[in-house]
Amino acid sequence: MKPRIVYRPLHGILLLDKPSGLSSNNALQAARRLLRAEKGGHTGSLDPLATGLLPLCFGEATKIAGLLLGSAKAYDAEIVLGVTTDTDDADGESLRERAVPDLSEADLQAALAPFIGRIQQQAPIYSALKQGGEPLYAKARRGERIEAPVREVDVQAIEVLGYGAPRLRLRVTCGSGTYIRSLARDLGEALGCGAHIASLRRLWVEPFRAPQMITLEALSAVLEAGAEAQTLLLPIEAGLADFARIVLDQTRAARFRMGQRLRDAAFPTGQVAVFGPDGTPSGLGLVDADGRLSPQRLFNGLNEIPAC
């Protein structure tokens, strides 16, 4: 009988290099078991086919997971022109094959131009978006007729990395909610031949622009070699780099952590990251135009050292 895993409180962010073939939740649970972390969450799903950066939040860091979900991201995508699939990627069943037209670099740039900026995009029917409280992919697997939602997304840049028919390599920088599978599908239709994603890798997620990622295999190896789990996590403040910062003295930090509002004309307005005098993050707050700081999310237990 396998020994029961004893979980412990860990607080911080792991920059996981997700492998292909694993769902984001399964990747999270695998990392959580290796770290023996009590609580964990990810910051937005990567398709099972995709590899690359999946920030995982543990303990008190789960309180900022939703904020990272809305961050800008960048991907490298390999697209196969001429074949459409039911999932819009290589994991799906082929639906239709069409001839790929001769395409110059100018043709590709002209075809890509309408997909840059704020655009309307229909999500894939095989996606984790929920409809009636159920993921679309569950309905699709049952063969139900689905009208996937159309949403406005922000595609900031598309760079052509290479093209040799039928394979096109792109680097895409985009905002939250953008489906690269949908981008490939719609680009294929614009070219008159259809397309799907052959491979996809997420390069970075704001604010982790140059991430030092770790694979599940490497994580397992360093833990087996005796590394302390907490030392493998980035501190919570690493995920707060894009927020205005307020440092409070000990008395006001204690009041903030008790949920009390504070007022100071010098506070920057908007959402802020609040720290105590020793640099430990106390939480997130919102400062109004009158300098009133209201607590939004409070971090607890960050100075506690977990048992090994």
UniProtKB/Swiss-Prot annotation:
Q: Provide a GO biological process annotation.
A: mRNA pseudouridine synthesis
Identify which top EC class this enzyme belongs to.
isomerase
Reactions catalysed according to its record: uridine(55) in tRNA = pseudouridine(55) in tRNA
Task: Tell me if Lyase is a UniProt keyword of this record.
Answer: no
Highest taxon, organism lineage = Bacteria
Keyword terms, alphabetized: Isomerase, tRNA processing
Enzyme Commission (EC) number: 5.4.99.25
The Swiss-Prot or TrEMBL record annotates one GO molecular function as: RNA binding
Q: Which residues form the active site?
A: D47
The record, for CDD domains, names: PseudoU_synth_EcTruB, PUA_TruB_bacterial
This chain's function reads: Responsible for synthesis of pseudouridine from uracil-55 in the psi GC loop of transfer RNAs.
So what family is this one in?
A: Belongs to the pseudouridine synthase TruB family. Type 1 subfamily.
Name the record gives this protein: tRNA pseudouridine synthase B
Q: Which source organism?
A: Xanthomonas axonopodis pv. citri (strain 306)
Q: What is the lineage of its organism?
A: Bacteria, Pseudomonadati, Pseudomonadota, Gammaproteobacteria, Lysobacterales
Q: What gene name does this entry carry?
A: truB
